[in-house]
Amino acid sequence: MINYLKSFFLYEIVRGMVLTLKYFFKPKVTINYPYEKSPISPRFKGEHALRRYENGEERCIACKLCEAICPAQAIVIEADEREDGSRRTTRYDIDMTKCIYCGLCQEACPVDAIVEGPNFEFASLTHTALIYDKERLLQNGDRWEQALASKLHKDYEYR
């Protein structure tokens, strides 16, 4: 009989509305994403970048440790030897659709050449736009060098 009266007076609906009104006047916990952005952790792993030294020379020494450690096999490197005996990459491709953003490539790099930057807004309509070549990775590194250097400096004691 009590269940019948509860359903007759729409007890569940009234209880739900009271709960809604309780939270209606509390401060919001969500953000309006495209217009407001939450702070990013210094350990955030976003879009990849290749860094350069201060003199403009690329840091990558073509040791291929990042290619070997990548669990998704998203990195492809080809290298040639220079006249001075050092090795440099001729091809450095990352397939961002395969990448799982684990950060192992960044941890394996002995010269901090490959890093994951602060950008997380790099969606694309085509698959080919998400295959990054060496030039695009170097452009990303040039664009975010100050942010990347401060991020690596903050995280240095934990590495």
Swiss-Prot record:
Domain 4Fe-4S ferredoxin-type: 51-80, 90-119
Cofactor entry: [4Fe-4S] cluster
Known catalytic reactions: a quinone + NADH + 5 H(+)(in) = a quinol + NAD(+) + 4 H(+)(out)
Record: residues binding [4Fe-4S] cluster 2: C70, C99, C102, C105
Keyword terms: 4Fe-4S, Cell inner membrane, Cell membrane, Iron, Iron-sulfur, Membrane, Metal-binding, NAD, Quinone, Repeat, Translocase
GO cellular component entries: plasma membrane
Predominant subcellular localization, coarse grouping: membrane
Top-level taxon of origin: Bacteria
Residues noted as binding [4Fe-4S] cluster 1 in the record, renumbered to the chain: C60, C63, C66, C109
UniProt remark on cofactor binding: Binds 2 [4Fe-4S] clusters per subunit.
An example molecular function term from Gene Ontology annotations: 4 iron, 4 sulfur cluster binding
GO biological process: aerobic respiration
Compartments in which it is found: Cell inner membrane
Family: Belongs to the complex I 23 kDa subunit family.
Main function: NDH-1 shuttles electrons from NADH, via FMN and iron-sulfur (Fe-S) centers, to quinones in the respiratory chain. The immediate electron acceptor for the enzyme in this species is believed to be ubiquinone. Couples the redox reaction to proton translocation (for every two electrons transferred, four hydrogen ions are translocated across the cytoplasmic membrane), and thus conserves the redox energy in a proton gradient.
Assembly, per entry: NDH-1 is composed of 14 different subunits. Subunits NuoA, H, J, K, L, M, N constitute the membrane sector of the complex.
Protein's name in the database: NADH-quinone oxidoreductase subunit I
Species classification: Bacteria, Pseudomonadati, Pseudomonadota, Alphaproteobacteria, Rickettsiales
Gene: nuoI
